[in-house]
Regions:
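Short, flexible loop/turn elements at secondary-structure junctions
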Residues: 207-211, 253-257, 320-323, 382-385, ...
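Short, surface-exposed ligand-recognition loops at beta-strand->loop->(often short) alpha-helix junctions
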Residues: 72-83, 206-219
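Substrate-binding/access-modulating region of protease and related hydrolase catalytic domains
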Residues: 218, 387-515
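Short alpha-helical segments and helix-capping/turn motifs at coil-helix boundaries
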Residues: 187-191, 255-257, 294-305, 362-366, ...
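A general structural signal for short secondary-structure junctions and capping/turn motifs
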Residues: 195, 241, 306-309, 369-371, ...
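Subtilisin-like serine protease catalytic core
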Residues: 304-338, 344-403, 425-427, 441-442, ...
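Autoinhibitory propeptides
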Residues: 2-57, 61, 68-73, 90-199, ...
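Extracellular S/T/G-rich loop segment that most often corresponds to the catalytic His/Ser-adjacent loop
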Residues: 322-329, 493-545
């Protein structure tokens, strides 16, 4: 039957020739000459040396057997091919690289148009991360001195010539990236005001992934020691998925230690005595136990529910909260698999998000009265549970649990089984994931969660459909309410869209929506729910969809 076919249809692959006309020449951006680079980088490398010496002195004796190392951040304009070999040739450990497209242009670094003329566009480049000890730092400085003095670089290390030519900045990875860029300092500042100083504050520590398992275990031991030195603790085991280069631990510290950190960073030195926050093995500090799904109270729309027996095996799955399987619209249409009995954590009225998503998958927008329900069962495996400590018992993954682990285990259970249980849903083709991490906007590189989806998609040949939530913050329209309301509707839409465009750097997609192998679902400024009461709200995009 046609209704039993897969829901997705893809066109035949075909080769599309490039458009005719003048070819676009993509070249390297302008960089300063040798003399100016020597002047610029000499100061940066001197600062780098001094920072590393201070770090060595500060960690001396803090952890037995800890070898002082540092993660170098090298930002370059343009690109350098095959740089990894050059990094490893001088004893540094390659940690990764990613594109950057927001280097401010200046007289030294700028993009050129097809005529070779300077433009005011942000400069595109690459960011390289490498980890090195004192010997690696000495080798780096030796190469720098040779390049500075116009001497030939040793064989196998000549790529450093290109790097020094194109380097915008070289520095140590530090508190700016690990704490400030992730928003943790602002989050803790807001959190601590009414908190008892002795209360434990939980968070997640993402570690730089080391290829050696021994080094990964040593990083965990070092973190545990540094936590204990400040009356903190590691919660549960570490999470490590080698195939995706993920390594993290759950941790907690007394609120007074977090307050100490904030006070010290606001002091004249802008430094802290808490070694955990300066440990070279830490990539990011992030919140844990976040609410991953947003639901709103409201009345449903009355509509007719199609009846009939559904017994065809599922090809669609949902990873979400526990749905109400006895709901009139869902009864007999879901195949619920709850191996951890998360259903027992729910009270009446808690099953909101899972029920809403199951209804959307099974029926679509029922208010339009056009879509027929799916003729197949839909497989549902809960990965969230209510948070008993939140005011509205919002659904989350508990502090001590890695949600990457829950997702990996859920998908493995579908296709391979678990323990004595066989594969629970091997016919699945599409997995719906309508949750996102509000604390993890996309920055630089795909998150561990996104990388996990990419790998699971490849391993099990399954498609993830990700809808990671709406941007929750206010939109700054740069006008008073009176001035805005005086505009015509088309001008309102035009003005608001320009304001949103200007704020795009802060309006990033939420993890895991940046997954490459997944379909990321956007939203339109319209639905089929009919009229609704706006109250004091103003429609910023009147007539738009």
């Amino acid at each position: 039957m046609a209704t039993s076919l897969p829901l997705l249809m893809f066109p035949q692959a075909r080769t599309i020739p490039p458009p005719k006309g003048r070819p676009i020449v993509i070249g390297q951006p302008h960089v300063p000459g040798h003399g100016k680079q020597v002047e610029r980088l000499d100061a940066q490398l001197t600062t780098l040396q001094q920072d590393f010496e201070r770090y060595k002195a500060s960690v001396s004796g803090s952890v037995a057997g800890l070898e002082p190392e540092t993660v170098l951040v090298i930002e370059i304009a343009g690109s350098v091919n095959e740089f990894r070999q050059a990094v490893e040739a001088i004893g540094l450990e390659w940690m990764g690289e990613w594109d950057i497209d927001d280097i401010p242009p200046d007289e030294d670094f700028f993009e050129r148009n097809t005529k070779g003329e300077r433009t005011n566009k942000a400069v595109k480049g690459r960011m390289f991360l490498s980890l090195g000890n004192e010997a690696g730092m000495r080798e780096l400085l030796s190469l720098w001195e040779k390049w500075r003095d116009n001497k030939t670089l040793p064989s196998g290390k000549t790529k450093w010539r290109d790097v020094f030519n194109q380097t915008v900045q070289i520095r140590r990875w530090g508190i700016e990236e690990a704490l400030r860029e992730t928003g943790m300092l602002d989050r803790w500042q807001d959190l601590l005001n009414p908190i008892n100083p002795a209360q434990a504050i939980r968070f997640q520590i993402e570690l730089f992934y080391r290829r050696s398992e021994d080094r990964r275990r040593q990083s965990e031991r070092n973190v545990a020691t540094l936590l204990h030195s400040r009356s903190g603790d590691q919660k549960g085991g570490a999470g490590a998925l080698s195939i995706m280069a993920i390594h993290a631990v759950k941790a907690e510290l007394p609120a007074e230690r977090i307050q100490q950190l904030l006070n010290e960073l606001e002091s004249e030195s802008h430094d802290t005595d808490i070694q955990l926050f300066k440990f070279h093995g830490v990539m990011y500090f992030r919140p844990t136990g976040q609410s991953l799904a947003v639901t709103e109270d409201g009345e449903g729309v009355d509509t007719e529910i199609a009846e009939g027996v559904v017994d065809l095996p599922p090809i669609a799955a949902i990873l979400d909260g526990v749905p109400n399987v006895q709901h009139q619209a869902l009864k007999g249409r879901l195949l619920l698999d709850d191996p951890d009995n998360l259903s027992a954590q729910y009270q009446p009225g808690d099953r909101k998000h899972g029920t809403a998503m199951a209804s959307l998958v099974v029926h679509g927008e029922m208010a339009d009265g056009q879509a027929d329900p799916l003729p197949r069962l839909v497989y549902v495996l809960p990965i969230m549970q209510p948070d008993p400590h939140s005011m509205n018992r919002s659904e989350h993954v508990p502090d001590e649990v890695f949600f990457e682990d829950r997702i990996a285990r859920a998908v493995r259970r579908m296709f391979e089984g678990e323990g004595a249980a066989p594969a629970q849903a091997p016919t699945i083709c599409v997995i719906n994931l309508s949750i996102g991490d509000p604390s993890r906007p996309f920055i630089h590189t795909p998150s561990p969660w996104a990388r996990l989806l990419d790998w699971l998609s490849w391993k099990y040949r399954v498609l993830f459909c990700v809808s990671a939530g709406n941007y929750p913050e206010a939109i700054d329209i740069a006008l008073s309410g009176t001035d805005y309301l005086a505009l015509t509707d088309p001008k309102k839409v035009e003005h608001v869209l320009k304001c949103i465009q200007a704020q795009l750097s802060g309006r990033r997609i939420l993890s895991p929506a940046e997954a490459i192998n997944a379909i990321t679902v956007g939203a339109t400024h319209a639905d089929n729910g009919g009229n609704y009461y706006q109250g004091q709200r103003t429609d910023l995009l009147p007539g738009a969809s």
